[in-house]
């Protein structure tokens, strides 16, 4: 039974559908694993085992009676704590929403329920998705399964740790500036940020509405493509979803590297760790040997991505988080003073340090006299970044670069220097600003046994090509990673 937790998503799907494995048996194995290792990894904020097992038993009953909802019926999936599920606490790892029970399902949750997935809610995250390590969670810091003294990345660190720690085969996260891809890279798994507008954001608690996107983590490539097909599509409840052809998982095929133009970056322009730099160059050499044409691209605008991202994201967060005022829902601090005192006391007690920092920065950039100098300029720069990506894809088929400049750092190593923490997103934020899709793929281990990831990027709504390249990359010997069985 213990070996079940080390099956890939594809193997689980196959065995459930051929009848050699029951959902209850599988879910029980995962719950046993969670009980054994999550005291170290702290991926879950809460775990209602009775409710989870009930879902698994219902799936098995449907299977026995020939009433399966889909080929995915009975597969377990983890849910980040900022995605609403009816009757479940959705806290965003914040004190201000600690006791908020969602009255409705996010669109992505409705789609998963329609297919019969077994939901494992409440995976830890940085508070309101603001962070790159989960150290900004109001409740706990998640740990990296490859080394529990290190961070798993963020903000979707709990979602990544759950999959990398073999507590689940797949999970959902959200990506505003790299919050799926960076933890996927640091935890040695697959993580996709779809094109903005591909997946509905209805029911995702907003951080920065023009940047946020829900996406999947998986322990193999098929989990990514299957989940993208299930989650994508136009939604009347989210006017930013786009009318495009429905993505189909079965249409994803490996792509021959021969004569394909791969956009690459000059590593000397960025402060990569030696191991990340060496692995990136090694992969490029391997692809060149398979006939790919390497095309150096001018990433000069990338140096502006971090300031542009933090001006736009914090401005939107300042607006979005103004709804948490202690009146309608969330933490309420009773005062004997005026209404303004209630707002101030509730927000001061409910929000963490990093969230307050970003609200203040966003409010400042939107204020009279500074709007044009900061927010207005950032929006103009965003247009330039978007245009630069459009130019890139006129000459290359795909862009390949490291996902993160370094492997996972130790817990507490960067908490005193927020700027250093922000720089961890230098390779991911521009993708959100441009709205294009990108996937982080495992790319082997460094000298300390820590995962390295590389990021593939294609043009808007070209996920078929993106996942085709990712599938081909997954076959390279140099990119193989075995997830840890023992958590140390």
From Swiss-Prot:
UniProt keyword Ligase present: yes
Region (Disordered): 136-158
Reactions it catalyzes: L-glutamyl-tRNA(Gln) + L-glutamine + ATP + H2O = L-glutaminyl-tRNA(Gln) + L-glutamate + ADP + phosphate + H(+)
Domain of life: Bacteria
GO biological process: translation
Keywords per UniProt: ATP-binding, Ligase, Nucleotide-binding, Protein biosynthesis
Protein name, UniProt field: Glutamyl-tRNA(Gln) amidotransferase subunit A
Organism: Leptospira biflexa serovar Patoc (strain Patoc 1 / ATCC 23582 / Paris)
Subunit annotation: Heterotrimer of A, B and C subunits.
Compositional bias (Polar residues): 136-145
A Pfam family annotated for this UniProt entry: Amidase
GO CC, alphabetical: glutamyl-tRNA(Gln) amidotransferase complex
Function, in words: Allows the formation of correctly charged Gln-tRNA(Gln) through the transamidation of misacylated Glu-tRNA(Gln) in organisms which lack glutaminyl-tRNA synthetase. The reaction takes place in the presence of glutamine and ATP through an activated gamma-phospho-Glu-tRNA(Gln).
Residues of the active site: 80 (charge relay system), 155 (charge relay system), 179 (acyl-ester intermediate)
Family affiliation: Belongs to the amidase family. GatA subfamily.
GO molecular function: ATP binding; glutaminyl-tRNA synthase (glutamine-hydrolyzing) activity
UniProt xrefs under SUPFAM superfamilies: Amidase signature (AS) enzymes
EC category: ligase
HAMAP family: GatA
InterPro entries listed in its UniProt record: Amidase, Amidase_CS, Amidase_dom, AS_sf, GatA
EC number: 6.3.5.7
């Amino acid at each position: 039974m213990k070996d079940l937790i080390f099956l890939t998503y594809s193997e689980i799907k196959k065995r459930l559908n051929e009848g050699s494995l029951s959902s209850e048996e599988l879910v029980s194995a995962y719950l046993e694993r969670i009980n054994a290792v999550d005291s170290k990894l702290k991926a879950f904020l809460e775990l209602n085992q009775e409710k989870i097992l009930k879902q698994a038993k219902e799936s098995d009953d449907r299977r026995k009676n020939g009433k399966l909802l889909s080929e995915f019926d009975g597969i377990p999936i983890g849910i980040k704590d900022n995605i609403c599920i009816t009757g479940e606490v959705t806290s965003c790892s914040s004190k201000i929403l600690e006791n908020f029970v969602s009255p409705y399902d996010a669109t992505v949750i409705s789609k998963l329920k329609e297919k019969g997935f077994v939901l494992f809610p409440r995976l830890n995250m940085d508070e309101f998705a603001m962070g790159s390590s989960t150290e900004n969670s109001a409740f706990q810091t998640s740990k990296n399964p490859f080394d529990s003294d290190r961070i798993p990345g963020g903000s979707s660190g709990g979602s990544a740790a759950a999959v990398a720690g073999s507590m689940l085969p797949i999970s959902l996260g959200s990506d505003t500036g790299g919050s799926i891809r960076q933890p996927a890279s640091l935890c040695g798994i697959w993580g996709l940020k779809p094109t903005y507008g591909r997946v509905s954001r209805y029911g995702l608690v907003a951080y920065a509405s023009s940047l946020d996107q829900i996406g999947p983590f998986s322990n193999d490539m098929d989990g990514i493509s299957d989940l993208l097909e299930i989650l994508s599509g136009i939604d009347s409840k989210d006017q930013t979803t786009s009318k495009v052809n429905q993505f189909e998982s079965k249409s994803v095929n490996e792509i021959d590297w021969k004569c394909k133009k791969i956009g690459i970056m000059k590593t000397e322009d960025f402060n990569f760790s030696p191991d990340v730099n060496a692995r990136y160059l090694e992969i490029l050499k391997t692809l060149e040997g398979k006939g790919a044409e390497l095309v150096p691209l001018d990433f000069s605008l990338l140096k502006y991505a971090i300031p542009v991202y933090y001006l736009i994201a914090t401005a939107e967060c300042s607006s979005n988080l103004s709804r948490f005022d202690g009146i309608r829902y969330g933490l309420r601090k009773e005062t004997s003073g005026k209404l303004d005192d209630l707002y101030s006391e509730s927000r001061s007690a409910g929000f963490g340090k990093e969230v307050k920092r970003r609200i203040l920065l966003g409010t400042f950039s939107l204020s009279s006299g500074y709007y044009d100098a900061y927010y207005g300029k950032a929006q103009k720069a965003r247009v330039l970044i978007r245009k630069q990506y459009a130019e890139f894809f006129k000459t290359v088929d795909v862009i390949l670069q490291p996902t993160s400049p370094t492997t996972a750092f130790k817990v507490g190593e960067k908490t005193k220097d927020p700027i250093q923490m922000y720089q961890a997103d230098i390779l991911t934020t521009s993708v959100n600003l441009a709205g294009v899709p990108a996937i982080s793929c495992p790319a082997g281990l460094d000298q300390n046994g820590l995962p390295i990831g590389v990021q593939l990027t294609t043009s808007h709504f070209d996920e078929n090509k993106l996942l085709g390249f990712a599938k081909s990359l997954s076959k390279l010997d140099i990119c193989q990673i075995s997830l840890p069985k023992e958590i140390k």
